[in-house]
Regions:
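PP2C/PPM-type serine/threonine phosphatase catalytic domain
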Residues: 1-207
Length: 207
């Protein structure tokens, strides 16, 4: 679609096999939906379109998780960005994040759906304490864990030169936001994903 781009990141949970099945199934379901339907939507329909994509993926993962004992209880996070013109539309569930890099600075566009984020929101702990909290990986929303899902939507303006970063907690647990901004600024566009992954792995990341 002219002037349109989109991206998706899913991070599975429920054991090595279940997590892989959940994230793959969610990704494939949304890929088919975008390929089939993206060209048909009008301006202003982006939110509803993306919500349907998440609903379809949630249903696919949930039906598999409840019908196959080998992957019982599996689920996956999801964060999706759809850029059309000067607007980026973001939908997410879980703690995979979207960031906007603009003019050398980085801004988190999503709010983690996690127990620890709820503690931060209520003022019980600080963001610095959250980064070290032993339960920081307990999420409160994910694809496939219940029959219905209410993902979160937001949007922001973008201009030429901006970058949208979609990533899992495998990156954000290892690399602080300030360093993410610096790495994006210093890396060529097509080199950036590899640079970020290498940095996370060197920091002890497992994803």
């Amino acid at each position: 679609v002219d002037g349109t781009g989109w991206g998706l990141v899913c991070d599975g949970m429920g054991g090595a096999n279940g997590g892989r099945v959940a994230s793959t199934l969610a990704t494939q379901t949304m890929l088919r939906y975008f390929d089939h339907s993206l060209r048909t939507i009008e301006n202003g329909e982006e939110k509803a379109f993306m919500m349907r994509a998440f609903d379809n993926a949630n249903r696919a993962v949930y039906e598999k998780a409840t019908s196959d004992p080998e992957v019982l209880g599996m689920g996956t996070t999801g964060v999706c960005a759809l850029q059309r013109g000067n607007l980026a539309h973001i939908v997410h569930a879980g703690d995979s994040r979207a960031y906007l890099w603009h003019g050398g600075a980085i801004r988190q566009l999503t709010r983690d759906h996690s127990m620890v984020q709820q503690l931060v929101d209520s003022g019980q702990i600080t963001r610095e304490q959250a980064a070290l909290h032993p339960q920081k990986n307990l999420i409160t929303r994910a694809l496939g864990v219940s029959a219905n899902i209410v993902p979160e939507y937001n949007r922001c303006e973008v201009v030429p030169g901006d970058l949208l970063l979609l990533c899992t907690d495998g990156l954000t647990n290892m690399v602080p936001d300030a360093e993410l901004a610096l790495l994006l600024q210093e890396s060529a566009f097509f080199d950036a994903p590899g640079v970020l992954v290498d940095r996370a792995l060197k920091g002890g990341g497992q994803d």
